[in-house]
Amino acid sequence: MRVDLFDFDLPENSIALRPASPRDSARMLVVRPDGAPVLEDRGVLDLPSFLRPGDALVFNDTKVIPAQLEGVRYRGEDISTPVSLTLHMRVAPSRWKAFARPARRLKPGDRISFGHGGSACLLGSLEAVVEEKGDAGEVTLRFDLSGPSLDEAIMAVGHIPLPPYIASKRADDERDRTDYQTVYAREEGAVAAPTAGLHFTDRLFAKLDEGGIERYFVTLHVGAGTFLPVKADDTADHVMHEEIGHVDPVTAAKLNAVRERGGRIVCVGTTSLRLIESAAAEDGNIRPWSGATGIFITPGYRFRAVDMLMTNFHLPKSTLFMLVSAFAGLETMHAAYAHAIATGYRFYSYGDSSLLFRKD
């Protein structure tokens, strides 16, 4: 499909720079693709009223790490070249893939020292060697530390990797360390938040429990590749980024039991959906799963296991707007987004939410 079919105009003032407070006070646009789309303006706290006892919410419990690193490249006696790196995938205890800016300043064998911007590494200096250069500014780094020691050092010197559309307008701060994290995050490794989950609070969970709604957790470590623009003119020519995740055997079995009883699988966020669909067989049976997924969902995809999707509002021509268009219909989503813009919904990671029913 032509990528420009997924384009739309978004006013700059529609982009949220801070989340709603409290988290569960955000708005929620309910979208039912029944012929002419049925759109309903509600709030996140209304979510339980759209679910039935025995339905299951699926959450991504990945935890965002401060993966934005500011460093200085040194090559021989040249130690004056600043570089910015966003870690996006761990490939070994001491090795990470990262996006570098400006990547042209780096080559294999260069050393980078981190923690010179006012943040001190408690374990001493944090350094890495550039092992490889890839496409689109990607590099592979081998750090001098490994495992938990490296994790502690990154925590000390790193910054929360805010999405580009926020970072271009303001610097990260201490509030973001809490705001850009779900209340149920536990598996460290993401460099972007599963943002639909940011709306959940203990109050909302209590209401869901009262309604007999089940909840389960899977893990997909969201990478910085989620923000990469689609540069191809046709979706068939786009190469999707990969992310690491897993669905454990107990969770897979319980989700299958929900489906067998007639309950619906409701994914909180596109990351949960992509992982569940990666784990699902053709018949919808959800299998235990672990590894890297590069699933790219566009209109025409047949959803195997997911019945409903709660998700924030996405960028024009992004792979995530393509995904929601596959789920609820391209015309439906264009109508929904036009309504959201006209009625003042807040967009993107810190913005409002939508609840989508799957198109038959």
From Swiss-Prot:
What is the similarity comment for this entry?
Belongs to the QueA family.
Gene name linked to the record:
queA
Task: Tell me one GO biological process term.
Answer: queuosine biosynthetic process
E.C. code: 2.4.99.17
Compartments reported by the entry: Cytoplasm
**Matching InterPro entries:** QueA, QueA_dom1, QueA_dom2, QueA_sf
Protein name listed in UniProt: S-adenosylmethionine:tRNA ribosyltransferase-isomerase
What Gene3D superfamilies does UniProt report for this protein, alphabetically?
A: QueA-like (3.40.1780.10)
The record's note on quaternary structure and interaction partners says: Monomer.
Superkingdom of origin: Bacteria
| Major place of residence | cytoplasm
Native organism: Rhizobium meliloti (strain 1021) (Ensifer meliloti)
Q: Per the record, GO CC terms?
A: cytoplasm
- NCBIfam families for this protein: PRK00147.1, queA
The reaction(s) annotated as catalysed by this protein in its Swiss-Prot or TrEMBL entry are: 7-aminomethyl-7-carbaguanosine(34) in tRNA + S-adenosyl-L-methionine = epoxyqueuosine(34) in tRNA + adenine + L-methionine + 2 H(+)
